[in-house]
Amino acid sequence: MDKERAGIQSVEVGFSLLEGLTRSRGPLMLKDLASAAGMSAAKAHRYLVSFQRMGLVSQDARTARYDLGPAALKLGLASLARLDAVRLARERLPALQEDIQQTLALAVWGNRGPTIVHWEESHQSVTANLRLGDVMPLLSSATGRCFAAHLAPEVTAGLLQEELADAARRGRHDVPTDLAAAQALLAEVRERGSARVVDTLLPGIVAFCAPVFDAGGHLALAVTTLGSVATFDPAWDGAIDRPLRAMADRLSGDLGYGQG
């Protein structure tokens, strides 16, 4: 019985390292991760060696920093896929794709921002190197703009300030570089019911993103579609935007939004 308790305690201690990486905004050095988990660096290293073998943690060979590994990503995505909102959305995507003939994706808010949790490619050729688990920027992606527009400001404030500073430093003209401009853009997203980018995230790519709300009025997920400017209607309320928003609105209703 004592051994059983010790074994469980050992798992709990090791899990504190995974929690530290989950809360972090990026990869961590050993000493910082150990400190976040409340243990010595030597003790943390022993756990991390095992976690690396299991794929729960990865280490950058160049920087020596630790981050969540592919197995942790798979666990997180599997859990998210079991959420009712994501499951229902996945069931609706084939019909929407048949209607608009474009690539579709689902995103939820993760600990580092809007995260792609499902991806369905169309037969249309799209030069978009996006993968499950990718985190989308708030300002230059339709997905990010949708989340920034509908989440509470305190949730996105840190990431938004970082991206504004980066855009200003780079001298970008296709995204906001100050808070006032960002707020105006996000107000337009809320007014139109969807977010759109053209050539902003990827050259020659257009994307729309529509929000899905739960019964409590909170943003549950976002539905994104993207395609080449050659085959994708970029018009507001056009052949892509309208059915995308309609699908998102129906899904919100099925989740109980607006019925209270």
Regions found by a protein language model. Give the residues of each.
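N-terminal helix-turn-helix
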Residues: 1-86, 249-257
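Short glycine-/small-residue motifs
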Residues: 56, 116, 221-223
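A structural signal for short hydrophobic beta-strand segments in well-ordered beta-sheet cores
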Residues: 57-59, 106-107, 212
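All-alpha effector-binding/dimerization core of bacterial HTH-type transcriptional repressors
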Residues: 77-125, 150-153, 185
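Short, solvent-exposed recognition segments
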Residues: 126-201
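Cysteine/selenocysteine-centered motifs that mediate thiol-based redox chemistry or coordinate metal-sulfur cofactors
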Residues: 158-172, 245-260
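Extended hydrophobic
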Residues: 174-248
